[in-house]
Amino acid sequence: MTMMDMNFKYCHKIMKKHSKSFSYAFDLLPEDQRKAVWAIYAVCRKIDDSIDVYGDIQFLNQIKEDIQSIEKYPYEYHHFQSDRRIMMALQHVAQHKNIAFQSFYNLIDTVYKDQHFTMFETDAELFGYCYGVAGTVGEVLTPILSDHETHQTYDVARRLGESLQLINILRDVGEDFENERIYFSKQRLKQYEVDIAEVYQNGVNNHYIDLWEYYAAIAEKDFRDVMDQIKVFSIEAQPIIELAARIYIEILDEVRQANYTLHERVFVEKRKKAKLFHEINSKYHRI
């Protein structure tokens, strides 16, 4: 195993640890594509964790400087400051793919702002956040998952990322509240007459369910729109993207089956993932 192979293996471990659903799906890509996904996921995870886990703004700055070095001089040797193994893997990817570096910087800017979290006044602010933390990831992955990236390809990948982030929010309402965060907008909370603290303390009510389903309908519509345009991605990537997205959309039904609980994180069981895999395998005849 070469040093570069070890770098990619390190990135893969990060992906498997933090997103079993993504790993389950994207590990089915051809080797070069899945390695690129591992590297990009690992970079994005380190960006997220720099503040959420480490509380280290200097580390986030180092990540940004390392990415800037790769963008400016992709073929030169660099003394990376953040995580050398991840950055070497990203540099290798950047030498072969047209990486959307600005999307990395947009993600970093969102993480900067997230240090001083305040509730969103409107849904527009919420959806802007979903773009910043997840739509950006879709943009960065676009050259990996398509043969000829176009404006439409970037748009579809961005919407998929935003949809998956909204699903994360719908899954983690209780956990986020425990961390003193409420992502639903004040505008929508007022409209549906919902107080998250009250729901957390006293249990789910019809007002909360209606609010939750309002946002779930948005995520489900975006999912359907993405599936309708799945052919913008490469033949190899189409079934993988559909598998990842369908596993994620299943999370919404898991929340429903758990009676919209705020006190337990739901997940999609392995047998359901396997069932989806076989359905999509039959549809595409190529996974």
UniProtKB/Swiss-Prot annotation:
Coiled coil: none annotated. It is an enzyme of class 2 (transferase). Its cofactor is Mg(2+). Pathway: Carotenoid biosynthesis; staphyloxanthin biosynthesis; staphyloxanthin from farnesyl diphosphate: step 1/5. SUPFAM superfamilies: Terpenoid synthases. GO terms for molecular function: geranylgeranyl diphosphate synthase activity; metal ion binding; squalene synthase [NAD(P)H] activity. (2E,6E)-farnesyl diphosphate 1 binds at H18, S19, K20, S21, Y41, R45, R171, Y248. One of its GO terms (biological process) is carotenoid biosynthetic process. Its EC number is 2.5.1.96. It catalyses: 2 (2E,6E)-farnesyl diphosphate = 15-cis-4,4'-diapophytoene + 2 diphosphate. Binds 2 Mg(2+) ions per subunit. A third Mg(2+) ion binds between the 2 farnesyl diphosphate (FPP). It comes from the Bacteria. InterPro entries: Isoprenoid_synthase_dom_sf, Squ/phyt_synthse, Squalene/phytoene_synthase_CS, Trans_IPPS_bact-type, Trans_IPPS_HH. (2E,6E)-farnesyl diphosphate 2 binds at R45, Q165. Mg(2+) 1 binds at D48, D52. Mg(2+) 2 binds at N168, D172. Keywords: Carotenoid biosynthesis, Magnesium, Metal-binding, Transferase, Virulence. Involved in the biosynthesis of the yellow-orange carotenoid staphyloxanthin, which plays a role in the virulence via its protective function against oxidative stress. Catalyzes the head-to-head condensation of two molecules of farnesyl diphosphate (FPP) into the colorless C(30) carotenoid 4,4'-diapophytoene (dehydrosqualene). Belongs to the phytoene/squalene synthase family. CrtM subfamily. This is 4,4'-diapophytoene synthase. The gene is crtM.
